[in-house]
């Protein structure tokens, strides 16, 4: 049988704990005060009984009553009654040395009382006993006669106080104390409820196990996210950093309790926190690194209590974007190749249906000769499959655009080194050839020449065209991102070429031919370079 487990909310637990503590503390305090008051009342009653007995024992009429059997009985009785009325005593007795009652208040039927040994030796005594069937506190004091050189105990005085009167006083005090305790408990319960509600509000209504689950999920997500994540408090001190952020910032491990401006100097994140403004996709430089950052200001009650910063390296994002762009271009080139062959197949099919067999054969031979010439040169001289695939796509695209793409017969290329990836080749070769296609689009002679060789220490790629060339004053500008004379959203191809060449440790030269047209020459070292000692591009002149 499965035992049913009871789950109590945080609010219930807090109220229960505080209530239990209040009950315990107030209960202990009430009992302590009650015991102290009870003991105090009893001591007060005992002291009053003894003090009254002593006072009466010193009175001359009382002493004379004991010394003389017939003396001052009426006067002594009057004194006793007065003392009884003044002190509120239940009964007062005057005894001789044998314990016989010589005088008593009221109409007591007692004839004799037992005396303690303390009385016989001149001491006072307090006891609890019964008188007329009622519980009393009895205080006794000796009656002492001074003789020459000594004192003699000739009798004693006993004063009784009812215990019920003391108990009533104690009960009254306990009732008052109980009322106060109940009021304090009630206020404590109300305070506990308010505190529990406030704590629940601070925890956004979440229970401890839910907070723990969210904490574990947060840590798992922060570990899985490849973006750098940093959070701060309202003072701009780092309270959280994931592993990716530490790696990007070249820190040995995630750090906290440091100002955000010390962790990411130059990013201006403290001003973001002070102004309470978000920064979407901002490019910032931190320690010679360029990041794309996004900031989110955390607000509560209209006040900022911290920021969350997410960031990635710009180069990583750029590589991803450029790769996607170039893969799309590569896909378009393959589509152009498919489209071109489809057109030629339909042309051959049409000639066959019309019975023009000789013309169909001539078209096939012509296409075969063109493809054979290009393919022989491509596959015999160039042994890099990546470059072969790119050029095949561009050949088909050139045919579709009615542009003559010529691969220089002196081209030669062995398999490329491992550090030169397909994305680099697509970016460099693809953009240079596409740029040449656009340059000759409005020319009467539409020809693009491609040359590649790996002789020497560098891989040399050269693309020339029969276009109008590049004005000398714009040679520097053509490699800037966004520069284009062809409209919006253009001017990124040559900038991407420059970036890819720099990543490979190479450089690019741009010149104008004497006969017209531009020549782009790229030099890429065969061995991977640690840095780039060359300029991003060089103008060789016309």
UniProtKB/Swiss-Prot annotation:
GO terms for molecular function: ATP binding; phosphorelay sensor kinase activity. This is Sensor protein CitS. The chain crosses the membrane at residues 14-34, 176-196. GO terms for cellular component: plasma membrane. The gene is citS. The lineage of its organism: Bacteria, Bacillati, Bacillota, Bacilli, Bacillales. Gene3D superfamilies: 1.10.287.130, Histidine kinase-like ATPase, C-terminal domain, PAS domain. Keywords: ATP-binding, Cell membrane, Kinase, Membrane, Nucleotide-binding, Phosphoprotein, Transferase, Transmembrane, Transmembrane helix, Two-component regulatory system. PANTHER family: SENSOR PROTEIN CITS, TWO-COMPONENT HISTIDINE KINASE. Pfam families: HATPase_c, sCache_3_2, SPOB_a.
């Amino acid at each position: 049988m499965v035992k049913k487990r009871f789950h109590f909310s945080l609010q219930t637990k807090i109220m229960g704990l505080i209530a239990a503590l209040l009950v315990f503390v107030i209960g202990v305090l009430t009992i302590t005060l009650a015991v102290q008051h009870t003991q105090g009342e009893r001591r007060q009653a005992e002291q009053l009984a003894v003090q009254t007995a002593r006072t009466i024992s010193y009175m001359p009429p009382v002493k004379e009553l004991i010394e003389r059997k017939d003396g001052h009985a009426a006067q002594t009785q009057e004194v006793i009654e007065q003392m009884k009325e003044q002190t509120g005593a239940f009964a007062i007795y005057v005894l001789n040395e044998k314990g016989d009652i010589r005088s008593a208040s009221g109409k007591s039927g007692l004839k004799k009382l037992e005396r303690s040994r303390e009385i016989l030796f001149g001491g006072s005594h307090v006891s609890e006993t019964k008188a007329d069937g009622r519980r009393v506190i009895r205080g006794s004091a000796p009656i002492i006669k001074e003789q020459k050189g000594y004192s003699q105990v000739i009798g004693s005085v006993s004063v009784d106080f009812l215990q019920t009167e003391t108990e009533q006083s104690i009960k009254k005090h306990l009732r008052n104390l109980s009322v106060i305790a109940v009021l304090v408990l009630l206020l404590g319960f109300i305070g506990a409820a308010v505190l529990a509600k406030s704590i629940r509000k601070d925890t956004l209504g979440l229970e401890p196990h839910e907070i723990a689950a969210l904490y574990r999920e947060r840590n798992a997500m922060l570990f899985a996210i490849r973006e750098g994540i940093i959070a701060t408090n309202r003072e701009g001190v780092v309270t959280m950093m994931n592993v990716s952020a530490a790696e990007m910032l070249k820190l040995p491990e995630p750090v906290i309790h440091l100002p955000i401006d010390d962790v990411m100097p130059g990013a201006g994140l403290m001003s973001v926190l002070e102004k309470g403004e978000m920064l979407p996709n901002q490019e910032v430089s931190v320690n010679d690194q360029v990041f794309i950052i996004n900031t989110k200001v955390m607000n509560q009650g209209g006040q900022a209590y911290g920021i969350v910063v997410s960031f990635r390296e710009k180069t990583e994002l750029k590589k991803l974007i450029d790769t996607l762009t170039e893969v799309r271009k590569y896909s378009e080139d393959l589509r152009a190749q498919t489209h071109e062959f489809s057109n030629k197949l339909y042309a051959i099919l049409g000639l066959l249906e019309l019975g023009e067999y000789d013309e169909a054969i001539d078209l096939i031979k012509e296409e075969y000769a063109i493809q054979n010439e290009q393919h022989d040169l491509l596959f015999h001289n160039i042994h890099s499959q990546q470059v072969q695939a790119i050029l095949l796509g561009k050949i088909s695209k050139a045919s579709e655009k009615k542009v003559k793409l010529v691969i220089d017969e002196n081209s030669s290329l062995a398999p490329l080194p491992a550090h030169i990836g397909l994305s680099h080749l697509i970016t460099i070769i693809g953009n240079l050839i596409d740029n040449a296609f656009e340059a000759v689009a409005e020319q009467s002679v539409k020809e693009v020449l491609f040359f590649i060789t790996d002789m020497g220490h560098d891989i040399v790629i050269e693309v020339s065209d029969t276009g109008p060339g590049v004005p000398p004053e714009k040679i520097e500008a053509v490699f800037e991102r966004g520069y284009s004379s062809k409209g919006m959203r253009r001017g990124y191809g040559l900038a991407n070429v420059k970036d890819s060449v720099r990543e490979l440790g190479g450089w690019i030269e741009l010149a104008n031919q004497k006969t017209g047209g531009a020549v782009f020459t790229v030099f890429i070292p065969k061995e991977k370079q640690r840095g780039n000692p060359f300029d991003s591009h060089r103008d060789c002149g016309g």
